[in-house]
Amino acid sequence: MNSAENYTYRYLETDDLDQYNALLRYTFQVTEEELTATGWKDDEIKQSKFPVLERADVLGCFDGDSLVSQFAVYPLKMNIYDAVYHVGFVTSVCTYPEYTGNGIMKRLMIQGLTQMHKEGKSFALLYPYSIPLYHHLGWEIISNKISYNIKDRQIPTKVSAPGYVRRVAWDNTEFHELHSHFASITHGCLFRNALAWEEYWRWDEDDTNVAVYYNVKDKPCGYMVYLIKNDIMHIKEMIYLNREAQKGLWEYIHAHDSMIDEVHGNTYFSEPIAFEMDDGDIKETIRPYAMGRIVDVA
């Protein structure tokens, strides 16, 4: 087997789209059945990756003309203790199995971090598929998340808010601006640019809904992204700027009690939701969420 030094390393271009998509499909085991379930066709999902190659830095390793390993760095901003920093979000990390174990990914990471430093990015982030691997490469866990399961009888019933909830389109401006406002006041939150929003929705089913809570002055103060399937409400994301919006969203969830048996969702480690329940005997699971490392302390 060749060593990492014997391969070619370069940034991918749009001409590499077919190989880029093939490596992603193989590594993350995206089947035709899964594409159909989410409403995608193979050519559509491939074409949807064009913006990634155009607006993100995708570094690849080639054995001859064949792409064998890659990862993408999305240019984002992050709120860290009320200061906004430029960060590189590493994603789409993948290598064909026959090329693992010989230092390719380590070399790609070094080159990627070096480029981030040149571009003035302060931090690098990723969602790990292997915590020990990234520990070995110098990354550390920086956040956790709580996954929760709530029975329909445990949904808060004694909550009410003076405002109202409306379902809106995925590209609704108030919805996007509300997330930006939330990010501006929340430590550890990423600001989403157009590319990040595209990735946010990539694998969501068409029946996924966005519900926004408005106060009595018609100001959006919270939202939830959710899907109802097989009598379960799956909450992808729920944020709120104040307690009123939080209560309003839970009131909205309770309005679905005749349609659902359970609520499944995720929340921040610092915000356990058992305290919000009339019956706090719910299932909550804490797991590591994101890993990060400092790129530049200047």
Give the residues covered by each predicted segment:
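A short, internal acetyl-CoA/4′-phosphopantetheine-binding micro-motif in the GNAT/acyltransferase core
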Residues: 90-100, 232-243
